[in-house]
Every structure is written in structure tokens, then in C-alpha cells.
Amino acid sequence: MAGSLSEIKGKIISTQKTSHITGAMQMVSAAKLTKSEQAAKDFQVYASKIRQITTDLLKSELVNGSKNPMLAARPVKKTGYIVITSDKGLVGGYNSKILKAMMDLIEEYHQDGNYAIIAIGGIGADFFKARGMNVVFELRGLEDQPSFEQVGNIIAKSVEMYKNELFDELYVCYNHHVNSLTSQVRVQQMLPIAELDADEAAEEGVSGFELEPNREMILEQLLPQYTESLIYGAIVDAKTAEHAAGMTAMQTATDNAKNVINDLTIQYNRARQAAITQEITEIVAGANALE
């Protein structure tokens, strides 16, 4: 009985230590989530403005007849996917949702291998490479609040691959942050630049402007910048969803640990009560034997 009590007590202490760790990790993830939400909000100011300008320009007569490859759809022989996952686990179903969505896409549309994956995050890169899938570029070790400088190379590389016709359309697959408890898988087309919402055009417009030095050079600068801002926005959004998933996973782990501790405490008290009862019974029996 003493051994049983000691064993239960050891489990309680071990679970308490685990609870302290997961509780601390929950607080860290919550702090990261707050910073990421603010970063995403700040970036939207820039992203909204460049989208307004691009939308208004594309709706104007200034781009009629443009042969810019980022605007013109071409026969799709190969599709590129930027897939955003985390570098580490302990984020609940965050990675599994994205990986399942990608596997479903490939099974439905790319059984002949006409796809290329640009993996952001070690979990996704390892997953695809372990299955012999076509990973053409990867980025690991993304910061908690990634700067454009950190991801600029892989973004520019993705756009350049499209312009060089290594693939004929480009999508980004990521978890969109809804709130601290919810995220949604998004597969969003980046290239060619799809039809834009006319309601988002800048109020002042650009139709009355003269483009210097010329239209094609303006588009050559603006369209990559616009596409890169969309991709970077998706990365920031995905990172926010990752922190939310981590916070929720650690909160669930902490709650589960507390439930285990409560159950073990009840089990310990019952075992201790049984041991005390047995000791009393043995003492009484011994006293009776002496009479």
C-alpha cells in the first residue's frame, strides 16, 4: 500500500510540473499572438493602399493591351503552391489541416506530378520531401513576427519562377486567422493576378495620370510589389494563426493536466484512507490478541 501511495504521489508531482510548463507556454503563445495580431493590423494599412492603387490602375484604360506576364493567363501546364506550416509542433491541428488540404489538391488535380511546392516551415518541408513530392524551394526558421527582409527572398523567388514559366499559376495555401479559437484553410490565387474588386479602387483614381517613364515599366515595378505584399500578408496571417493554435493547444493541455491531478488526488486520498483503515484494523486485532 505504501508503494501504491508513493507511486500516485509521484504521478501527481510529475503532472503538476507538466502543468506548470504548459501554462507557461500558453502565456508565451498569448503574448506572441497579441504582437502578431498588431503586426497584421499594421501591415493591412499598407496592403490596402497598394491594392487600391493596383485595382484602380488595372480597371483603367492605361493597361489595355499590356503584355505583362503577371496579368496574362496562359495554358496551365504546371501549378506552383506556396505552403505555409510551422517549424515545430505543439500547435494542435494547425499543420495537419494544411497538409491534408494540399494532399487533397494534389490527389484531385496533380496525379501526373504537374505541380511544384514552395515550402515555408520545416513541418511541411519534411512532410512533402519524405513522400518524394516536388519541393523546389523551402524556408525554415521563420521568426515569430517575420519581417519582409526574412521572407523577401523566397517571395521574390516564387514570383520569378512564375515569370520564367517554371509554373503557370501560383497559389498560397495557409491557415487564415479568424480568432483565438478558429482558423480557416485558404488556398488563394496569387498569379496570374485575378480580377480585382472595382469597389477597392482608390477614390482619387489614376486614370487621369500620365505614367512615367511608360506604362510597362510602371507595371513591371508595381505588379511584383503588389503580389509580394499579398504573399507576405498571407505569411503574417498564417503566423498569427499558428500562435493562436499554440495558445489553444497549451491551454487544453493545462486543463487536461489539472483534471488528471484532480483524479489522482482523489485516488491518492482513497488509497490513503484505505491504508489508515487497514492500520487501525491491524492495531485493534493485535490488542484483542493480547487480552
From Swiss-Prot:
The keyword Lyase does not apply. InterPro entries: ATP_synth_F1_ATPase_gsu, ATP_synth_F1_gsu, ATP_synth_F1_gsu_CS. GO terms for cellular component: plasma membrane; proton-transporting ATP synthase complex. The keyword Glycosyltransferase does not apply. It comes from the Bacteria. It is found in: Cell membrane. Its main location: membrane. GO terms for biological process: proton motive force-driven plasma membrane ATP synthesis. It is a peripheral membrane protein. GO terms for molecular function: ATP binding; proton-transporting ATP synthase activity, rotational mechanism. CDD domains: F1-ATPase_gamma (cd12151). Keywords: ATP synthesis, Cell membrane, CF(1), Hydrogen ion transport, Ion transport, Membrane, Transport. SUPFAM superfamilies: ATP synthase (F1-ATPase), gamma subunit. Belongs to the ATPase gamma chain family. F-type ATPases have 2 components, CF(1) - the catalytic core - and CF(0) - the membrane proton channel. CF(1) has five subunits: alpha(3), beta(3), gamma(1), delta(1), epsilon(1). CF(0) has three main subunits: a, b and c. Produces ATP from ADP in the presence of a proton gradient across the membrane. The gamma chain is believed to be important in regulating ATPase activity and the flow of protons through the CF(0) complex. PANTHER family: ATP SYNTHASE GAMMA CHAIN, ATP SYNTHASE SUBUNIT GAMMA, MITOCHONDRIAL. This is ATP synthase gamma chain. It comes from Streptococcus equinus (Streptococcus bovis). The lineage of its organism: Bacteria, Bacillati, Bacillota, Bacilli, Lactobacillales.
